[in-house]
């Protein structure tokens, strides 16, 4: 499923996909299975409260491979690449992606799970290898997932960007390219304090896209990340 929002106002939430199971077992109890895979929410304009690549409301369901593209909308609360919203969820929210190019949003979750569900292997991309984050874009805290297990959660920083904070990522990758980088500014600026729960041994920098040739007596310096406060 794919939902594209280009304008107007949605006073609740926009969903790429929703999973509910209204079937009953032999004893008349609601079944608790049902997965959400490969759904997409594209936000190009308008105003919404929350956005979900997929919302899985079954207890044992999984959210996998769902995507959100934020490309100009205003999101008053949060974005969830893949979410398990059953209070006692036992499934996993894994392999979901949120791409941020422009617009405004509160917090961002690659994966989200209530109950015992896991939120691993999710990705958030700031910009792309060809497109910078637009000036004026506002983003709160970006979470790989809402759980303490951060295995394979990845934040890709492809452009200069300012966000509130980042949390619950195992991998942090900076891709530096002439077309998307202004070296006069920090690549990633945090505005609400020092980040936490990052494994700095997993920091990766790809500078193969920089073609600048500094003078022999000048160092070419790029400040990867700073804390505005």
What does each model-identified segment do?
Residues 1, 8, 12, 22, ...:
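The right-handed parallel beta-helix/beta-solenoid scaffold, focusing on the short coil/turn
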Residues 4, 25, 32, 42-44, ...:
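Compositionally biased amphipathic helical and low-complexity segments enriched in hydrophobic
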Residues 5, 31, 43, 70, ...:
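Structural motif
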Residues 11, 25, 32, 58, ...:
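Serine/threonine-rich low-complexity intrinsically disordered regions
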Residues 11-36, 49-64, 78-94, 107-120, ...:
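Glycine-centered low-complexity coil/loop motifs and glycine-rich tracts
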Residues 115-118, 128, 133-228:
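Extracellular beta-strand/loop-rich repeat segments of large surface/secreted proteins
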């Amino acid at each position: 499923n794919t939902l594209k929002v280009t304008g107007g106002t949605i006073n609740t939430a926009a969903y790429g996909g929703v999973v509910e199971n209204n079937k009953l077992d032999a004893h008349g109890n609601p079944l608790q299975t049902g997965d959400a895979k490969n759904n997409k929410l594209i936000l190009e304009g308008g105003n919404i409260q929350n956005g979900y690549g997929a919302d899985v409301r079954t207890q044992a369901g999984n959210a996998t491979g769902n995507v959100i593209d934020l490309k100009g909308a205003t999101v008053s609360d949060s974005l969830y690449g893949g979410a398990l919203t059953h209070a006692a969820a036992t499934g996993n929210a894994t392999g979901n992606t949120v791409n941020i190019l422009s617009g405004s949003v509160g917090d961002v979750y690659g994966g989200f799970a209530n109950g015992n569900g896991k939120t691993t292997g999710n990705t958030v991309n700031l910009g792309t290898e060809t497109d910078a984050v637009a000036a004026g874009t506002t983003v709160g805290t970006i979470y790989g997932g809402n759980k303490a297990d951060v295995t394979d959660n990845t934040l890709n920083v492809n452009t200069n960007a300012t966000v509130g904070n980042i949390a619950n990522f195992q991998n942090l990758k900076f891709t530096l390219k002439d077309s998307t980088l202004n070296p006069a500014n920090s690549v990633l600026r945090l505005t609400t304090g020092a980040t936490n729960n990052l494994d700095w041994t997993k920091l990766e920098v790809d500078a193969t896209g920089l073609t600048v040739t500094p003078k022999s007596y000048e160092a070419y310096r790029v400040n990867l990340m700073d804390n505005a406060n």
